[in-house]
Amino acid sequence: MKSVVIQQPNALVIEERPLPLPGAGDVRVRIKLAGICGSDSHIYRGHNPFAKYPRVIGHEFFGEIDAVGEGVESTRLGQRVSVDPVISCGHCYPCSVGKPNVCTSLVVLGVHRDGGFSEYA
């Protein structure tokens, strides 16, 4: 699949990457649309201290579920989805009081993990 990859600050390439396989409890999304925002620009320019490189940016994206991992109902296949890029643990204190945005294990797609500027995520 083709992906937009920030190799390091100010160095962007379109790269061929392997098709991701969904893990247990996960789905794979065939990306239809992805938006770009200031956060992506900051990662490109090297102004986001949390970004790790190389990185597929894009945390605002929409698509269709085309594969499911173990434990996910096959009825999800074909569903259109808008992706919430913030992944929280659900168990730490901030998560337990309804503040998953400050989870102690917070992961953001397009920042800590590859995001939506690919054909699949």
Which residues does each predicted region cover?
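Short Gly/Pro-enriched turn/cap motifs at secondary-structure boundaries
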Residues: 7, 18-19, 52-58, 109-113
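Residue-level recognition of beta-strand termini and adjacent short loop/turns
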Residues: 8-10, 23
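Short N-terminal binding/cap micro-motifs at the start of the first secondary-structure element
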Residues: 11-14, 38-39
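Glycine-rich beta-strand-centered segment in the early N-terminal region that forms part
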Residues: 20-34, 47-93
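Cytochrome P450 core scaffold surrounding the K-helix E-X-X-R motif
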Residues: 39-45
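NAD(P)H dinucleotide-binding glycine-rich loop of Rossmann-like/cofactor-binding domains
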Residues: 89-121
